[in-house]
Amino acid sequence: GIARDAAGRGVSVALVEQGDFGGATSSASTKLIHGGLRYLEQYEFRLVAEALAEREVLLRIASHIAWPMRFVMPHAEGLRPSWMIRAGLFLYDHIGGRISLPRSESVRLARDGAGAGLAPRYRSGYAYSDAWVDDARLVVLNLRSAHAHGAQLLPRTRFVSAQAREGRWRATIEHASGARETIEARTLVNAAGPWVDVVASAAGGRSQRASVQLVKGSHIVVPRIHPQPHAYILQNDDRRVIFLIPYERDFTLIGTTDVRVDSIEASRTIDDDETRYLLRAANRYLARPLAERDVVWSYTGVRPLYDDGSNDPSEITRDYTLELRTFDGAAQLDIYGGKITTYRRLAEAALDRLAPHLSYRRGSWTHAEALPGAPSDRVAARAELHARYPQLPRVLLDALFRRHGTLTAQLLGDATTLEALGEDFGGGLYERELRWFVENEWACSADDVLWRRSKAGLHMSARLRERVGQLFAESEKIA
């Protein structure tokens, strides 16, 4: 987000990423664009208001990868009283200013499918609106926009160190080949997520005033538990909530956990206790209990939260903190915390802080310019795609549209039949789209394609996934 905003203001930008773009925390969220209903209990009113306002912006500028979703909260005896939930939802409806989504309401769960999949003892609840986003696609589309505005993007490139001298940084970076290079810059923005303190130490030094608290969040994916389009937000007896979200047509996404951790490297996968926690929290409400054998996939991310001294990981603020320091006249901005919903506002705040050190050709602009592929009218754009490619299955066209929006026609070109799309890898992934990911979205491995640029891996057998991996191992075949 910062690279896109800065490049669009005429700043010369080089972005260094040690792995794949979105390969860590950015693609491991619960994939919600939301104010955060539970943050009202922590009196984070400014954060909630800002996030709700941003929800409106993102639904407009990323309309093909973000869409409204209705959330149902069953009333659970012995947990939050009805008056508290109603008061919170009333505030949630109004604190973000003008909104386009339907407001909250009380619901009878047996009516209109609102309680589909739930145990019959849950008879009443509440419904409200938020939104869902494909987080990994959001990363890639921001980078496509940044690149179009002139940013130099360097994936699989490690930041080694930087020294400040006479108002400029000399940064050493290491490419995947092992070759090292030195680049110069007036400012250094440290948006390394869980590695923010590591990068700070390799540059001007760690901040004495701010530090990161690492919190592990894991999710599981199970076969879809109900056919309705709404998600569930379920209260747990530890006062946390978990989400059950329709996911990739055939599945339900369940998350998240909050576990304080000391090491990033030891926290890359879900552990058994987290799996059992999520299943137990869901099974309290479900008519058909889930078992560990139902889990078809899981993923884990480490959140780099600003350490505000909270003992409970769930109570640590999700707001962002920007720490600006100068070394021999060169500026270093370290970024702590933040959530995906407010990434664009964080970028604006970062550029505001850096304004004394940089020259901008224009002011804030990312609220007004759509991300690549975002249509102004999603329904009309999808209908136009169907009409243009009548021989291709609509389910395939719709999946492509949800990833690429109006760029789908550019991807397909003159390929009007399935045969023209090249090899069928299964899971709705064809050779033509795979090449698009490689040539236009910096994909270099099977994981980049199957689990981030798309989620085709969920719909494929292990044998088919291995075929994609083999293709990348024989990289000349997709070069």
Q: What label would you give each PLM region?
A:
Residues 92-144, 152:
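Short linear elements at protein peripheries
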Residues 5-29:
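Glycine-rich FAD pyrophosphate-binding loop
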Residues 122, 129, 135-138, 145, ...:
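C-terminal catalytic lobe of FAD-dependent flavoproteins
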Residues 31-114:
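Dinucleotide-binding Rossmann-like beta1-alpha1 core, especially the glycine-rich loop
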Residues 190-206, 348:
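Flavin (primarily FAD) binding-site architecture
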Residues 126-187, 345:
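Helical element adjacent to the flavin cofactor pocket in flavoenzyme catalytic cores
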Residues 7, 52, 147:
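Anion (oxyanion) recognition and catalysis
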Residues 183-193, 282:
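Short hydrophobic core segments
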